[in-house]
Amino acid sequence: VMTVKDLHSDIVYIPSSADDGVSGHGPYRAVEPSFYFENPTSKFHSERGMPAIMDYKSLSQMLTSGHLWPIDDVWGQHDFTRTGAQGDTAFIGMTRRRFGDQALESAERFAKYAQWINYDGYRAMYEANNVNRKGLLIWMSHSAWPSLAWQTYDYWFRPTGACAAAV
């Protein structure tokens, strides 16, 4: 079997944007902003992110009224999952600790308060990686379909709290 290296030995191939000379592999879930400062990397960080909840208007476009609230498995189909990299329970817990149960009374309230969680998290990612100008690329700036993770703006081009932190 011929490989790219066999056919084109002068081409550098990096098999993953998170390996080989950079620091990557998340975290991709919500962590306290202090985590980024307490766990510095000595390299450019090529992949980092957290759930990025869109505004209520976008949520209403993405989910039918029967699945808009409370959070259910349909949210999981749009990347807000209990298991896996996103770990929505961490995000929900953060929202509850910061804003109380009122933040979880409706989709509209959750979307509103989630912007602050996104802003604080993404701002901390950038500020912590600014030390010694190491740099950071988030995973990812936008999604190819309506998603609740890793985006600075949503499928309908509406900015999330992460966008405000990134500028």
Where in this protein do the model-derived segments appear?
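Active-site groove signature of glycoside hydrolases
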Residues: V1
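Acidic/polar loop patches that form or flank catalytic/metal-binding clefts of enzymes
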Residues: H8-S17, G135-L137
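Short, surface-exposed recognition loops and adjoining beta-strand edges that mediate ligand/DNA contacts
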Residues: I14-Y36
